[in-house]
């Protein structure tokens, strides 16, 4: 059964190889035009080409910078609007340290730390 599938594949592969051989003998440059070959450039032409490429690159980067300025920089905005637990904790610590002793004396319990667990329970928030 597999023998009957083999001859069409063989004929097709021979046809493809024959066509590929015909394409290799025909000149490819006439069909696609003259390709760019950097080895045939003089030194002055290569300098001009390099200068043009650098100029295009600088223009592309300038356009990208203008787009970023028009849209606004996303990095600084993201840092300002940080809502993670770590950021919120740092904000609260900063608020407590700036507010002074008034908040510490009124809102925070006096006994905090590892020694509190051995003592009796008190309601510090009343």
UniProtKB/Swiss-Prot annotation:
Instruction: Alphabetically list the UniProt keywords.
Output: Amidation, Cleavage on pair of basic residues, Disulfide bond, Receptor, Secreted, Signal
Tell me which positions the record assigns to the signal sequence.
1-25
- State where the protein is found: Secreted
Sites bearing Glycine amide, chain numbering: 118
Is Disulfide bond tagged as a keyword?
yes
Q: Which domain of life is it from?
A: Eukaryota
The reply on keyword Disulfide bond is yes
Expression sites (tissue/organ): Mainly expressed in the thyroid gland and CNS. Found in the nerve cells of cerebrum, hippocampus, hypothalamus, pons/midbrain and thalamus.
A single cellular component GO annotation: extracellular space
Checking InterPro entries in the record gives: Calcitonin-like, Calcitonin/adrenomedullin, Calcitonin_CS, Calcitonin_gene-rel_peptide, Calcitonin_peptide-like
Enumerate the propeptide ranges: 26-78, 123-126
Q: Which cysteines are joined by disulfide bonds?
A: 82-87
Instruction: Cite a single GO BP annotation.
Output: adenylate cyclase-activating G protein-coupled receptor signaling pathway
Q: Please give the SMART domains that the UniProt record associates with this protein.
A: CALCITONIN
Citing just one GO molecular function, the answer is:
calcitonin receptor binding
What function does the entry list?
A: Stimulates cAMP production in porcine kidney cell line LLC-PK1 via the calcitonin receptor (CT) but not via the CT-like (CL) receptor.
Indicate the family of this protein: Belongs to the calcitonin family.
What is the protein name given in its UniProt record? Calcitonin receptor-stimulating peptide 1
Native organism taxonomy: Eukaryota, Metazoa, Chordata, Craniata, Vertebrata
Q: Which gene encodes it?
A: CRSP1
